[in-house]
Amino acid sequence: SGLYEYLSVTKLEPEDQIDVLDFSLADIMTRGSTTVFEQGWCDEKSIEHMGESGLRTIVGPVASSSNFMTKDGRNVYYNMHEQQAYDRLQYVMDTRQKYDGAYDGRMTVALYLGQVDCCTPEYLDEVRRVMDNDGEMIVTIHAAQSINEYEQIARTYGKTPAGYLYDHGIVGSRVHYGHYLMPQGHSMNAMKLMKPDEELKLIAGTNTNIIHCPWSFGRRGMILESLQHYLDLGINMGIGTDTFTQDIIWEMRYAAIFCKIAEGANPFTGTAAEVFNMATLGGARAIGRPDLGRIQKGCKADIVIVDLNNLDCQPVRDPIKVLVYSACGKNVDKVIVDGKLIVDGNRPVNMDIDKVIGRMQQAQDKMIAKVPERDWAGRSADEMSPMSFRVVD
C-alpha cells in the first residue's frame, strides 16, 4: 500500500530538506492557507526556516515508540525504539521552551506522536503526564487511517484506536486525531468492538478533534462515511491538505463532494458552509485559537483574498459556494498573516518561485534514483508507480 511501501522509499537527501520545505511553504501559502501544522523530524534549522516564512506555524516534532515498515509487501512490521521516544519527547519540551511564541507569536510548538499503532501504553501514559503538566500543548496522532493499523490495535489491546487512546488519556480539546477514516461501521471495517457510534461518540464526548484530509485518501478510493455523520455527532472537524497539491480550497471541495457520495447522493449534506467552517473555525478551535479563523474585532489579521473575477468563478451569487465548488488555489490573489502581506498576485513575496521549483525537481530526481535500494523488493520508481503511458526515447 502507499502508506507502508511508498513512505519508506520517498526519503530526501539531507541537503535537499530546506529546498523542499521552501517549495512546500510556497505551495501552502499561495493556495490560501495562513496557518500550517508541520509534523515530522523538525530540526532547529527547519523550525527557524518556517518561522521566517511569514506563515503562522505549528511545528510538531515526532516522538513515537516505533515506526512501521514492510519486508514483504504483505505484512506490517514495527521497528521499536522506545528510548528514542522518551528522548524525542524531551526534545519537544525543550523546543517548546525555545520557540513556542517566537516570531512575533506566530509559532506554536506541539507534540506529534506519529501513528497510534506506533505508541506503547507505557509511552502514552508518560505523554499524558506531560500533558497534565503543560495544559496548553497541542498533541496530534494519526489514528484509524488504515485497516492494518486498526486490526493491530484490536489484536494487541482489544480496543478500537479511540478506545485505546482514551484509556491512556490522549483525548481532549487540544488533541487531534489525524484522519480517523475507518471506524467501526465503515465499509472497509468489519470489526465490532463497540456498539454502533460508541467509538465516534467517545471522540465527541471528550471534545477531541478530528482532522479530515479528503484528497489524501480519496484519490485511492477511500472516503469518510460520512463527514455529515461526524458533524452531527458533535465532533469538531478541521481540514488538512496532507499531500500535494496543498490546496485548502480543493480540500474543501472534496470534503463536500465525498460527503454527498457517502450519504447516498444527498445534496444537502456536507454543505459549502460546513466545509468552509471546518477550514476556518474548526481548525482554529482545534488549536485553541478563538482569535483565528474569523474576521472580527480582537482577532488576528490573517486574511485570504480570492479573485472571483475570472472564468472559474463567474457568475457569482453565493461567494462561499463559488469558493468551494468552482475556485482553486490559483485564484488566491493575496494572503495576509498577522497584518503582513506574504502572497501578492498568487506569488510569495519573499521567495524566488522559479528557483524553488527548479530545486524541488532536482531533489525529486535524486530521490527517485535511490528508490531501488530502499524498497524491500528492489523495485524502481517506475515499477512501483508506473508511468501513465509508455515513455519513448
Where are these regions (language model features)?
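Divalent metal-coordination and catalytic microenvironments
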Residues: 32, 50, 111, 142, ...
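A conserved active-site cap/scaffold subdomain adjacent to cofactor or substrate pockets
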Residues: 182, 188, 204-229, 233-235
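Glycine-enriched alpha-helix->loop->beta-strand junction motifs that scaffold or abut catalytic
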Residues: 54-56, 131-136, 170-173, 202-211, ...
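Metal-coordinating catalytic core of metallo-dependent amide/deamination hydrolases
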Residues: 48-189
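His/Asp/Glu-enriched, well-ordered alpha-helical/loop segment
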Residues: 166-174, 225-310, 326-328
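Alpha-helical scaffold segments that flank or form the walls of functional sites
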Residues: 1-55, 87-104, 361-366
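Active-site microenvironment of metallo-dependent hydrolases
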Residues: 277-393
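Histidine/acidic-residue-rich catalytic or RNA/ligand-binding cores of hydrolases
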Residues: 147-159, 185-200, 221-230, 245-261, ...
